[in-house]
Amino acid sequence: MANTVLRIGIVGCGYAARVHLGRLSALDRVLVVGCADPDRGAAESFAAQASASSASTSPVAAFTDHRDLIKQCGADALAIFTPHLSHYRPAMDGLQADCHLFIEKPLSTNVQEAADIVGLARGRNRKVGVGHQYRLLPSLVEARRRLSAGTIGPLRLVTATLAQGWLATHGGAENSWRFDPKVAGGGILADAGDHLLDALLWSTGQVAVETAAVQHRLESGLDVVTAAVVRLAGGTPVTLAISGVSPGQLFEIIFFGERGRLRATDHSLLEELGDLPAQAVPLAEGGPSIDENFVAAVLDGSPLCCPADEALDTVRLLEAIARSAATGQAVRLA
């Protein structure tokens, strides 16, 4: 685009928005022009914080309705950090107003809404980036490169695990929405597990075509444990394990090929070839943040870290896993 500064409106003024604000405020080519949250106090507090960190002398405007933000602030882009079930309406309204979008993951919690966003963005020629920042991890970037190069031979099996004390560590009033399926659209699967699903699909370069799953749910319907088997388009089977009631933090994907295997975590990559001992793979330094990636994509035309059409594949798998667990039947995606 011709502008040298990206005018961004923030929709949803909770914890995630404040984290992203810290990174956006450090970028010379960004101006936060307004914010919206149904909680007026949250919107005004965020606006004050954004104004204090801005180089502009104009205060950041606060609204309780994202439509007023769109109408009054002249934003080039919206960054959406609402609870998951509330992504759709501001995304569609923003696209209708010719705004580019950054949407915190997941793109949506159901395939139809995600497809609507992708279709409208394509029709309006707008960029939509989704917050799957695990794609920027040096360990996964290098694993993807080695898989594409065939370093471990044909891929025969993948195991993917995410375990954390999600239920215990996301307490407090501000994060209480995460534990209400009617607001969040699900539990650990959609809230953190989708990072694992997206990393799996992105690193292998394949989409999922079939899955069968079981879940443990609380009385409220909140899923806290998911186990699934997935078949990728190339025929490779995958086992998935996601727990939100386990202490510590584990993110691990193991890729088994005919000539060796790769073990990727969020901070390391091990490679084993043949019968040789495992070797730590040297990793590059981390690159731009996902926020910087989005700004560069809009202003310079560089590639998005996670464009919406790719995030749609993750939503398809997320929805299929949830449906399989609910029905007790395998679900085909294609």
Predicted regions and their residues:
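Predominantly a Rossmann-like dinucleotide-binding segment in NAD(P)-dependent oxidoreductases
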Residues: 134-212, 328
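C-terminal helix-rich "cap/oligomerization" subdomain common to oxidoreductases
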Residues: 1-2, 77-79, 233, 296-334
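N-terminal Rossmann-like dinucleotide-binding module
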Residues: 1-57
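Contiguous beta-strand/loop segments that form the cofactor/metal-binding neighborhood of enzyme cores
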Residues: 197-268, 290-303
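Basic phosphate/pyrophosphate-binding loop/patch that engages nucleotide-derived ligands
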Residues: 119-127, 141-157, 233, 257
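Hydrophobic residues in well-ordered beta-strands that form the structural core
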Residues: 103, 128-130, 159, 264
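Beta-loop-alpha module in the N-terminal Rossmann-like domain of NAD(P)-dependent dehydrogenases
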Residues: 20, 58-120
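Active-site loop of classical SDR/Rossmann-like NAD(P)-dependent oxidoreductases
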Residues: 41, 280-292
